């Protein structure tokens, strides 16, 4: 079982979850998800230095959660919702797997209880 799940290892999924592990990046992604924003607008509410913001954006872009594009002197950031949708698919598959396992365990416990009763 472990080997089969390792064979299906997806490094893109690892990058996505690593990017989402930071609350600052999640907040930035939530804001970008409402519409493309310039880097300066993303930096304003955080109080963080621009190099720190750029590192966070680099992680989000590396995970393909956002795209950035230079428009004149402004760098715009836009979300890629299809990447999150793929992540939701993986989570749904995991949820179904674990629900099936707990259903089987519940059925086994019910059978054992009936035998003892």
Sequence positions of predicted segments:
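Acidic-residue sensor for enzyme active/binding pockets
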Residues: 41, 61, 106
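Alpha-helical residues within the helix-turn-helix
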Residues: 44, 55, 61-62
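Residue-level signal for short amphipathic helical patches enriched in basic/charged
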Residues: 20-23, 60, 82, 93, ...
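N-terminal helix-turn-helix DNA-binding core of bacterial DNA-binding proteins
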Residues: 7, 11-52, 74-85, 89
């Amino acid at each position: 079982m472990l080997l089969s799940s390792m064979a299906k290892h997806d490094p893109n999924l690892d990058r996505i979850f690593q990017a989402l592990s930071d609350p600052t990046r999640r907040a930035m992604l939530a804001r970008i998800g409402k519409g493309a924003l310039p880097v300066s607008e993303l930096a304003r509410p955080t109080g963080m230095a621009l190099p720190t913001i750029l590192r966070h954006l680099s992680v989000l872009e590396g995970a393909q959660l956002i795209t950035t594009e230079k428009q004149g002197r402004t760098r715009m950031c836009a979300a890629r919702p299809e990447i999150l949708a793929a992540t939701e698919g993986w989570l749904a598959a995991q949820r179904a797997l674990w629900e099936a396992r707990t259903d089987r365990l519940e059925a086994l416990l019910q059978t054992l209880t009936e035998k003892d009763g």
